[in-house]
Amino acid sequence: MEFFTMCVLAAGIGMALGTLGTGIGQGLAVKSAVEGTSRNPGASGKILTTMMIGLAMIESLAIYALVVCLIILFANPYKDIALELAKSVAK
């Protein structure tokens, strides 16, 4: 059962680190966009469009981290091997 405990721990840490990085990246992107708009209000349309594309790319990293963590939790390819090993050790 330690295998499943470690899978849950790995998924939790992976998701935490994935969202931490994307949160910091999105904050810095919005900060730069607001500074650029305050310096040149005429370019706010281009800045907003570029910022939205950048935020979508940054957010995709968090979605990839979520997908990997869900695979670790629910579709782990090593689950059967770990269960067989646990049964053989218990006998």
Swiss-Prot record:
GO terms for cellular component: plasma membrane; proton-transporting ATP synthase complex; proton-transporting two-sector ATPase complex, proton-transporting domain. The keyword Transport applies. GO terms for molecular function: lipid binding; proton-transporting ATP synthase activity, rotational mechanism. It comes from the Bacteria. CDD domains: ATP-synt_Fo_c. Signal peptide: none annotated. It is a multi-pass membrane protein. It is found in: Cell inner membrane. It holds the Pfam family ATP-synt_C. Keywords: ATP synthesis, Cell inner membrane, Cell membrane, CF(0), Hydrogen ion transport, Ion transport, Lipid-binding, Membrane, Transmembrane, Transmembrane helix, Transport. The record marks 59 as: Reversibly protonated during proton transport. Its main location: membrane. Disulfide bonds: none annotated. The chain crosses the membrane at residues 4-24, 53-73. F(1)F(0) ATP synthase produces ATP from ADP in the presence of a proton or sodium gradient. F-type ATPases consist of two structural domains, F(1) containing the extramembraneous catalytic core and F(0) containing the membrane proton channel, linked together by a central stalk and a peripheral stalk. During catalysis, ATP synthesis in the catalytic domain of F(1) is coupled via a rotary mechanism of the central stalk subunits to proton translocation. Key component of the F(0) channel; it plays a direct role in translocation across the membrane. A homomeric c-ring of between 10-14 subunits forms the central stalk rotor element with the F(1) delta and epsilon subunits. F-type ATPases have 2 components, F(1) - the catalytic core - and F(0) - the membrane proton channel. F(1) has five subunits: alpha(3), beta(3), gamma(1), delta(1), epsilon(1). F(0) has three main subunits: a(1), b(2) and c(10-14). The alpha and beta chains form an alternating ring which encloses part of the gamma chain. F(1) is attached to F(0) by a central stalk formed by the gamma and epsilon chains, while a peripheral stalk is formed by the delta and b chains. Belongs to the ATPase C chain family. NCBIfam families: ATP_synt_c. This is ATP synthase subunit c. The lineage of its organism: Bacteria, Pseudomonadati, Thermodesulfobacteriota, Desulfuromonadia, Geobacterales.
